Amino acid sequence: FRPGNMQHDDALSAALARCGIPYSSCVGLAVFDSQDARYRLHSGVHRRHGVLEMPVLTFQDWQLGGRRHLKTLTIAGTSFDETRLLLERAHEQGIPLVVLLTHPFEYVQRRDDSMRTARGNALHQDRLARLCRYLDGNRDRFLPTGMGEAGDAVQAALRAAPDERNVLLHGSGWRSVRRLAEQAVYDRYGSWALARQGAPA
């Protein structure tokens, strides 16, 4: 189960338990923070009211002085280089599960929700394709799967060796800067291309 916009609280977990829903992925701290310390989850798997919560990975992408910036792992908002680095660091630290968030609409650029004027988002499509190739080439360390299958596998592993660590992974500041620049340039180009596409002949 995943709620819209990652909106969650303790009452939601209790309701999921009453409904017999065994797995949830409700937490993505950089998207929504309920301010409940019990749900300030960055990674891993955690039981709440008997429901196995598998938060979308939240990581620190940069820090300036005492100010740190948190980001939730998505295709649209994270470069392939950043994602690969996070997967490597998660593997090094034995984090049992990494959840990445994406949506179909992120792979097209559009002028409005009518989709009358749209084009493929080559930047996001390339990130996904590169991630898929990377995961396919590293199946000895990473097993791409859906939430239900992941929940079953993690549930069995936790019975053998309970692990509720909540590790905050650190990304790379310079990779974040490069991603921000890349995204800004591509978004501007996409807006220009859409304007040309929608212009009257």
Name each region found by the language model:
Residues G77-P200:
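C-terminal domain-boundary segment and adjacent tail
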Residues P3-I95:
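Active-site-adjacent pocket scaffolds in enzyme catalytic domains
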Residues F1, C26, T145-M147:
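Residue-level detector of family-conserved "landmark" positions at structurally sensitive sites
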Residues R2-P3, N121:
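A generic secondary-structure micro-motif detector
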